[in-house]
Amino acid sequence: MSPKSSGILKGHFLMAIPGLPDPNFAQTVTCICEHNKTGALGFIINRIHPLLTGQELFEDLKITCNQAIDKIAIHLGGPVQPSGVFVLHGPPFDWHGCLKINDWLGLSNTRDILEAVARQEGPENFIVLLGCAGWGPLQLDNEINDNAWLTIPVSQEILFKTDVKLKWEMTMMQMGIVSDNHSDNSGKA
């Protein structure tokens, strides 16, 4: 049973279809962390804050940080709770309130993981995000049925290792879609 037909997209990427008119999500890759009858929660993983540095973020949070943390990118996770700070990360998963998404991916947003990341003592693989994306009951299911999104299982390589500018293109290529050969129109067969 596919995620589309079962309604369970936790642990999947959502890729905006080529030509999606919503500027909040055009050419985005979103990691879905929760999807159930009450709605869905996800994080855009291919948009970087143009001005905010890691050091500035942690100083704003009054968290002491290692100077090298300034080199990490701060991702724009979505238009909901834009000042909320979240961490998508690999093991360990023993942070307060960690939501384990699959065997190798968790979501946390408590001070313990933020302090560990700031000191470079946290998980080996992580991305720091501001804000999230949210959908109400059946909203995401309806958008998928209306062909606004494509889905594939989350990939460690794309999430943690691929250049942010290439993530949308790489996920589309995994589906066999080459960005030069697509239509900006969607529909149903």
From Swiss-Prot:
HAMAP family, per database record: UPF0301
GO CC terms in record: cytosol
One Pfam family this sequence matches: DUF179
Family indicated by similarity: Belongs to the UPF0301 (AlgH) family.
This protein's name: UPF0301 protein HRM2_24640
Record organism: Desulforapulum autotrophicum (strain ATCC 43914 / DSM 3382 / VKM B-1955 / HRM2) (Desulfobacterium autotrophicum)
SUPFAM superfamilies: VC0467-like (SSF143456)
